[in-house]
Amino acid sequence: MMKKYTAKDLETFQRDEQGWLICPSGDYTAIREFPEKCIFGNGCSFGRRCRFGKCSNFDVFCSFGETSAFGKCSNFGDVCSFGEGSCFGGRCNFGKQCSFGEYCCFGHNCSHEGLTNSIYMAVDKIGIELRKTYFFKAEEGYFVRAGCFFGTLNEFKTQVHETHGGTIYETTYLMACDLAVKLLDSQWK
């Protein structure tokens, strides 16, 4: 069981020589407001409507409730999950296999999966597993995250054809690819 921290605990945490507030792994669901330049350990959990100052850093496997807001230049480790309606300032970076609820919004120049200046869209309840599939457009091109798969759009299409050729799953995945390209192109600046 993770230690549950309160706002009072947050006041006792130390800052390192560069001014970063060191926050250990734990349950932060009782806290709504966090200052700038916090560093959180892995597996931290946060409640709904949390607000984080700019330049916060989160380790892997952190989870965030609905409508949380993050300042610019925040960094997130792999496999973090975000509730619906969360908003991120510009230049935020997201690790691999992060998941996002509906209606999340992203500032300019955010990066997902290590891609440069990426934007994304998701199609839910698709494929044999009926899971969410993420499509990204970045300076490096188009990419797809579907379960354990992460690769280029063309690699994904090849994998879909080899795995689901001639089935409804191939048809729906390829339709989702076409939709993603059209929508991402319309949003690309």
What are these regions (language model features)?
Residues 1-54, 60, 66:
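Extended, small-residue-rich solenoid/repeat segments and analogous flexible loops
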Residues 85, 94, 100-154, 158-159:
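Glycine-rich hexapeptide-repeat left-handed beta-helix
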Residues 1-29, 128-189:
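Terminal amphipathic alpha-helical/low-complexity segments used for targeting or macromolecular assembly
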Residues 36-113:
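A detector of tandem-repeat and repeat-rich interaction/domain scaffolds
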Residues 12, 19, 30, 45, ...:
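Low-complexity, compositionally biased segments
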